[in-house]
């Protein structure tokens, strides 16, 4: 008999769903409990490692350790020890499959959707294998629950009403890498190549001048900085084009200003055409950065 209906793995710090079982239950009551689970996932950091919320037909159980939590929607006939044994098994399987770095860097929902096959396998095992075959594991969990009972949540703790959770506006935590940019264009690739070339020229001239100045005099510090500052600005322009960054316009203007001022300062060491080339590449890169927009957010993969 099926007593575990749905399971998912989420990141504790922001409630980002990492993987979930593909469910085939679409009753109104079940969908309501899915919404409750999603609401609760956003606030797991507020609760201890284990907790349960029970209703008439369904119950939610969660178990977390570190930055990974496993959550399940079960029938009310499902013993708590079995639910937490299932969640602990799932937690071990997930953390054995993915390291903490991958989990921490995940930026989109269901980044580890392929783990669904493991969830289904473990879920089937707990739903259809007799409890006598899991006696050892269940006894261990039962002892732990006696020593440290799980937090008991009310249905109000999982409610979502008009987009407000318990009278508080939900925080939508979304790390910067979660922003996905539009595909790179041919002109954008050209601007990257030219920018890297300008950065290399600035670095080579700056290092060469620094070596010469150390042997001769310390009067060339201004010229050295005028080469190295635009070098850093060119590299940062490449970063701004490839990745999203907050306050992008302000950073673009600042980098463009550094490059223009640096090249104007080098008027005695570069001819007019060289200066115009460097400034022209900087303007092209700035234009490409500002015209490359964010992609529209994708839906939650239909899980």
Curated annotation (Swiss-Prot):
Keywords per UniProt: Endoplasmic reticulum, ER-Golgi transport, Membrane, Protein transport, Transmembrane, Transmembrane helix, Transport
SUPFAM superfamilies registered for this protein in UniProt: SNARE-like
Top-level taxonomic group: Eukaryota
Primary localization class, coarse: endoplasmic reticulum
Entry comment describing in which tissues the protein is expressed: Ubiquitously expressed.
Alphabetized CDD domains for the sequence: Longin (cd14824)
Membrane topology category: Multi-pass membrane protein
Cytoplasmic topology ranges: 1-183, 245-248, 292-303
A Pfam match: Longin
Gene3D superfamilies: Longin domain
Subcellular location: Endoplasmic reticulum membrane
InterPro entries: Longin-like_dom_sf, Longin_dom, Sec22a/c
Record-linked SMART domains: Longin
GO cellular component terms listed in the entry, alphabetical order: endoplasmic reticulum; endoplasmic reticulum membrane; membrane
Lumenal side, ranges: 205-223, 270
Protein's GO biological process: endoplasmic reticulum to Golgi vesicle-mediated transport; protein transport
Annotated TM spans: 184-204, 224-244, 249-269, 271-291
Residue ranges of domain Longin in the record: 8-119
Job of this protein: May be involved in vesicle transport between the ER and the Golgi complex.
Family affiliation: Belongs to the synaptobrevin family.
Name under which the protein is recorded: Vesicle-trafficking protein SEC22c
Lineage: Eukaryota, Metazoa, Chordata, Craniata, Vertebrata
Gene that this polypeptide is encoded by: SEC22C
